[in-house]
């Protein structure tokens, strides 16, 4: 009976407390305004009521009854707590959604769920990032090309050096027997014979010889192919060319007469006629065949006068030209040699270029590029031809008619040149006069003494009046002559 009485008291207390709590939630607006702190206070009240009820039950006398009542009270309190929690969840779900309260909440991605849901994918490594030889094919090609270029440079340079030394060894005895000095490099003030070639670069070698009668000196230039250049080697596979030996002999003015003459391949003569100043002015006709003198069809002749051709084409010269026609590119004798034509952007030069009496020879080395040191021996007879041409040019002289014709040709060329440059020379003279006047005016203006400045101005005015009077006198004389 006591236990039942205690149970009724607990129910009354719990009902009164819950009824007092739910009175605050009669209006829906109150529920919306209720925040988390209010619910925390509500939970504190529930805990206080639960703790007070068992304290009141402990005062009973029967231990067993007290234990039973206490357990039943705890079970009922737990059931009441669950019912209150369900009631609160239902009330919060029925509340209206406030956008301002949860602003920015939906924008935040759920990183934890996405990390767990994303599947693990294995990415294939690109081919160019794989650690294999195929990934370095470009580097391999570059290194291979660089090594090929270096090897070709070394081999080509050494071959040109061997060819040059082979040529010099073959011709050294002949050169030393005809010239006192062989191989002067020009580094010393006094001419000294070094007895070796002077290397200009990897494919050009020079040799200067002097100390012979009727000539100032002879410059020999060995112009080999650019074997050290890999690109040039590849280009020569499609268009073969030959090594060349160019010889320039500078004659003394008194040891060579006035004439222009050339013999060589037709292609070479056409090119020289366009490029060389003397051939374009004194040999304006097309190259003529040398069949009349027994020359092969591959060779042609350019000459200022027929007398020069007859004098130069003697038996020994024809012998050289006929037997070594495949090695001869051109032979050019001229007293008006000034080199290639001068191309100026602002027009013709104001004076004729300086000329020298020279003999020019261009020989092709046998082999068409595939040259060996032993092929240099085939050029030795051509050096004998050069020595013979020096003596031949010294002995040959024009007759009176030929000399007069040569002088007329040179006067004609000079006159044509002066006509072409007349306007330019007038402009140059006018600019010099204006510059002189400007300098005179500046000198007068810079004078500080007024009296001296006045005298200078009067002197300049008198000079101008005298020049004007001279011009008027010349005009009167011209009118009188015309009458």
Curated annotation (Swiss-Prot):
Biased composition (Basic residues): 473-483
Superkingdom, taxonomy of origin: Eukaryota
GO molecular function: calcium ion binding; protein folding chaperone; ribosome binding
Pfam families, A to Z: CCDC47 (PF07946)
UniProt keyword list: Coiled coil, Endoplasmic reticulum, Glycoprotein, Membrane, Signal, Transmembrane, Transmembrane helix
Residue ranges, compositional bias (Basic and acidic residues): 105-118, 430-472
Assembly and binders: Component of the PAT complex, composed of WDR83OS/Asterix and CCDC47. The PAT complex is part of the multi-pass translocon (MPT) complex, composed of three subcomplexes, the GEL complex (composed of RAB5IF/OPTI and TMCO1), the BOS complex (composed of NCLN/Nicalin, NOMO1 and TMEM147) and the PAT complex (composed of WDR83OS/Asterix and CCDC47). The MPT complex associates with the SEC61 complex. Interacts with VCP, HSPA5, DERL1, DERL2 and SELENOS.
InterPro entries assigned: CCDC47
Ranges in the topological domain labelled Cytoplasmic: 21-135
Transmembrane segments: 136-155
Record organism: Macaca fascicularis (Crab-eating macaque)
Protein name: PAT complex subunit CCDC47
Regions of this protein lying in the Lumenal compartment: 156-483
GO biological process: endoplasmic reticulum calcium ion homeostasis; ERAD pathway; multi-pass transmembrane protein insertion into ER membrane; protein insertion into ER membrane
Keyword Transmembrane helix: yes
List of glycosylated residues: 178
Compositional bias ranges of the Acidic residues kind: 60-104
């Amino acid at each position: 009976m006591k236990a039942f009485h205690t149970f009724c008291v607990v129910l009354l207390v719990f009902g009164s407390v819950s009824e007092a709590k739910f009175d605050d939630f009669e209006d829906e607006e109150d529920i919306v305004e209720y925040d988390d702190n209010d619910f925390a206070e509500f939970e504190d009240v529930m805990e206080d009521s639960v703790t007070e009820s068992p304290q009141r039950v402990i005062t009973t006398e029967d231990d067993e009854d007290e234990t039973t009542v206490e357990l039943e009270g705890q079970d009922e309190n737990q059931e009441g707590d669950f019912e209150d929690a369900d009631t609160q969840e239902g009330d919060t779900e029925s509340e209206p959604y406030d956008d301002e309260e949860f602003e920015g909440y939906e924008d935040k991605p759920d990183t934890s769920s996405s990390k767990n849901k994303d599947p693990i994918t294995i990415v294939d490594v690109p081919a160019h990032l794989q650690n294999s030889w195929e990934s370095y094919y470009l580097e391999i090609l570059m290194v291979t090309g660089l090594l090929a270029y270096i090897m070709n440079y070394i081999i080509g340079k050494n071959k040109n050096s061997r060819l040059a030394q082979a040529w010099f060894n073959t011709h050294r005895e002949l050169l030393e027997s005809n010239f006192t000095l062989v191989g002067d490099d020009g580094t010393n003030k006094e001419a000294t014979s070094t007895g070796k070639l002077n290397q200009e670069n990897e494919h050009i070698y020079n040799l200067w010889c002097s100390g012979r009668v009727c000539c100032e000196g002879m410059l020999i230039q060995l112009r080999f192919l650019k074997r050290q250049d890999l690109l040039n080697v590849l280009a020569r596979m499609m268009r073969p060319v030959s090594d060349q030996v160019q010889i320039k002999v500078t004659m003394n003015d008194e040891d060579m007469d006035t004439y222009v003459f050339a013999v060589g391949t037709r292609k070479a003569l056409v090119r020289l006629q366009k490029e060389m100043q003397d051939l374009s002015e004194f040999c304006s006709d097309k190259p003529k065949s040398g069949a009349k003198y027994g020359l092969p069809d591959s060779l042609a002749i350019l000459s200022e006068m027929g007398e020069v051709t007859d004098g130069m084409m003697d038996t020994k010269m024809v012998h050289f030209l006929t037997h070594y026609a495949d090695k001869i590119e051109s032979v050019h004798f001229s007293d008006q040699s000034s080199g290639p034509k001068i191309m100026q952007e602002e027009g013709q030069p104001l004076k004729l270029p300086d000329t020298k009496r020279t003999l020019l020879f261009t020989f092709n080395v046998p082999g068409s590029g595939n040259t060996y040191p032993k092929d240099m021996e085939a050029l030795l007879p051509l050096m004998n031809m050069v020595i013979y041409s020096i003596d031949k040019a010294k002995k040959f002289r024009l007759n009176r008619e030929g000399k007069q014709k040569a002088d007329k040709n040179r006067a004609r060329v000079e006159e044509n040149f002066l006509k072409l440059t007349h306007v330019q020379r007038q402009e140059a003279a006018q600019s010099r006069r204006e510059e002189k006047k400007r300098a005179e005016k500046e000198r007068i203006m810079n004078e500080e003494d007024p009296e001296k400045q006045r005298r200078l101005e009067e002197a300049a005015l008198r000079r101008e009046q005298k020049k004007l009077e001279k011009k008027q006198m010349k005009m009167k004389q011209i009118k009188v002559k015309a009458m």
